[in-house]
């Protein structure tokens, strides 16, 4: 049994239940902007994924085929979130496309990182960075889902 997979799946289930109970039912009452901004701020912290390249944060031998794409994908997602924030704050017409770009790239990054970690057996080498896929990735996956819901149903005109 892969304990990391169990942690990732169960944490995702817990975050999904929380979103379903507390956030999704309230989306019709909330302005899209008030939901998207905190999510973008959360994802702006994905630069922490660079820990997969930091000696001491991961154990020697972590597969580079996982570590580099995961770290750099997280950095790209963080930068895209930071770029989208001012557009959302200013209610720019670019807000929706920038948030959409961030959301697609960020989601693909997480799916790729999970797949690469599984394929290359990265879990035993994660060391202190283990909390990223066990806790952080599930939270990010669920918030990406929420943004897709907003982009698909609730986003009318500029934010």
PLM regions and their residue ranges:
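Membrane-interface helix-boundary motifs at transmembrane edges
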Residues: 24-36, 89-97, 155-159
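A generic, lipid-embedded transmembrane alpha helix
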Residues: 41-55
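Non-cytosolic membrane-interface motifs at loop->transmembrane helix junctions
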Residues: 61-72, 98, 123-134
